Amino acid sequence: MSPRGLPAPPDDLPELPTTKLGQKPLWRIHPADVDPWFFDLGPDGRFNLAESGTCCLAEEPIGAFVEKFGRLLRPGGVIPEPLVDAQRLSSLRPPKASVVDLTDATVLGLIGLTAEIHSTSDYDLTQGWALALQEAGYGGIRYKARHDPRGELVSIAVFGSGKAPRSVAKAASIPVDLIHEASATFAITVLPRHHSRRR
């Protein structure tokens, strides 16, 4: 690690700032044929846990939108309409858990974390942090959405526990007003289906 790089988790973690889940619904955009409560075990998620998995959610619908589609943009900020139509927006009530709040400024002094934790592509390192925090007894991580250049939107990584959450998700097609919000805020354009076929 360079002197300015993201540090590895220490052997002994101090008490960290937390947020309680379970009071407000969280949001997730996912394929229509996939359960909203999907705990990803794969290596391609920032805070994925290899054994129990991690489910990434957003505090606002627009956060779920930008995290889902921000990495799939075509040149010009375009998303084909069929891709959007194949997804669902789910409102989920998370399990009651205490998650580490990595948006709290005190994590700089407590464990040396900077904003790089929210955006680095070194997933081996961020997954190492997730494992260390899970082993310390935390139920997940609150962090900044990578695809929001303003750094305002917040995501939640919920660690898998081996038991499926009891809450029932309310799934619906991506609403038009959310598409309009993404256009107004992030200049993301959903290309109508007939244009998609011409490409």
Say what each PLM segment does.
Residues 46-75:
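Extended catalytic/binding region for NAD+/ADP-ribose chemistry, centered on the ART fold
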Residues 1-42, 46, 75-199:
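Active-site and NAD+-binding cores of ADP-ribose-processing enzymes
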